């Protein structure tokens, strides 16, 4: 089968597509013939040598994919049959023509969505769902500040925040992105390149601050985050795009806010946790991708590349130009 590969860590120029052995499904696993796989920041970090796959995971890039069930391993429980369409949450391996998946990490394709659209859901939407509900304990009426609000996770988080009855606020780096955030349901957006998002957030909330922050930036934002955090607020850190170093009195500022700093990753969670998350998402959220009206959810796709243009896809994401997801299509 064909798969994305790199021989040494470095820039996008190291990526290429090569022939590798097709995997075989193990106990309780399904072999998925991949139609499409979306790009995530973790793919860029792994390519750079900064994010190793979890033990036992494929070293091929790709944390989410959609396609057709091609083979069932021993011990499968009969939830899937050969030929079914499905989308999958993966610890790696999605950017290849075939990938093995524990059957509990597969989800049905929502009615009305293409396989390419569906590939943009698993990692991004399950991450946003986990951050808001399982980690951040979002409540109706909460102000939620979403950094990188027009990323894949960000576009999902805006919509899920609205669904929870909370109020999404976003940061982004262009007017175009902020306009899209408003269309998705953001109550306000702040251009971090042109204004102090912390002061703008406090002004919008009439000095109260935000109850929940979803932060994939990290170090460079710490002081502004604490400044606009409400009393007893929750700050959920799930990425370090702005670095991991802190200089200054973070703990004292956080303490006087009675604030909570919580860290979270999804990729390294065990399969039992991921299956619980997939089940909850499938039951509570997935139907809303197919309903009509204001509660309908929408995976936001920016660009679609053939997998042979993997270098261009990485360059585009690294330039922070994307609004929503970048999806790779695999040859069928």
UniProtKB/Swiss-Prot annotation:
Belongs to the zinc-containing alcohol dehydrogenase family. Quinone oxidoreductase subfamily. Changing residue 151 to V: Loss of enzyme activity. Its EC number is 1.6.5.5. NADP(+) binds at residues 41, 148-154, 173-177, 192, 264-266, 322. It comes from Homo sapiens. One of its GO terms (cellular component) is cytosol. The keyword Coiled coil does not apply. One of its GO terms (molecular function) is protein homodimerization activity. Homodimer. This is Quinone oxidoreductase PIG3. Catalyzes the NADPH-dependent reduction of quinones. Exhibits a low enzymatic activity with beta-naphthoquinones, with a strong preference for the ortho-quinone isomer (1,2-beta-naphthoquinone) over the para isomer (1,4-beta-naphthoquinone). Also displays a low reductase activity for non-quinone compounds such as diamine and 2,6-dichloroindophenol (in vitro). Involved in the generation of reactive oxygen species (ROS).
């Amino acid at each position: 089968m064909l798969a994305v590969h790199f021989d040494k860590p470095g820039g996008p120029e190291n990526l290429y597509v090569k022939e590798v052995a097709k995997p075989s499904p193990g106990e309780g696993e399904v072999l998925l013939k991949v139609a499409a796989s979306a790009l995530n920041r973790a793919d860029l970090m792994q390519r750079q040598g900064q994010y190793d796959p979890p033990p036992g995971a494929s070293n091929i890039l790709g944390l989410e994919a959609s396609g057709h069930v091609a083979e069932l391993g021993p011990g499968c429980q009969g939830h899937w049959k050969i030929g079914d369409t499905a989308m999958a949450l993966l610890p790696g391996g999605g950017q290849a023509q075939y990938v093995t998946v524990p059957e509990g990490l597969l989800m049905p394709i929502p009615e009305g969505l293409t396989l390419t659209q569906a590939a943009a859901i698993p990692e991004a939407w399950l991450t946003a769902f986990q951050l808001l509900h399982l980690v951040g304990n979002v409540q109706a009426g909460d102000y939620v500040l979403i950094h990188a609000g027009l990323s894949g996770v960000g576009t999902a988080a805006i919509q899920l925040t609205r669904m929870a009855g909370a109020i999404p606020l976003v940061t982004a780096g262009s007017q175009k992105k902020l306009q899209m955030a408003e269309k998705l349901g953001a109550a306000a957006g702040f251009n971090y390149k042109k204004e102090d998002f912390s002061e703008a957030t406090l002004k919008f909330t009439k000095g109260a601050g935000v109850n929940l922050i979803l932060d994939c930036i990290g170090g460079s934002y710490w002081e502004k985050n604490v400044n606009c955090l409400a009393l007893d607020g929750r700050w959920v850190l799930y990425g370090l795009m702005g670095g991991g170093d802190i200089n200054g009195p973070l703990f004292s500022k956080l303490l006087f806010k009675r604030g909570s700093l919580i860290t979270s990753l999804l990729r390294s969670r065990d399969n039992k946790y991921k299956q619980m998350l997939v089940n909850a998402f499938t039951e509570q959220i997935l139907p809303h991708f197919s309903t009509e009206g204001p509660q309908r959810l929408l995976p936001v796709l920016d660009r679609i590349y053939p997998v042979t243009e993997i270098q261009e896809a990485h360059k585009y994401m690294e330039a922070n130009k994307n609004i929503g997801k970048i999806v790779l299509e695999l040859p069928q």
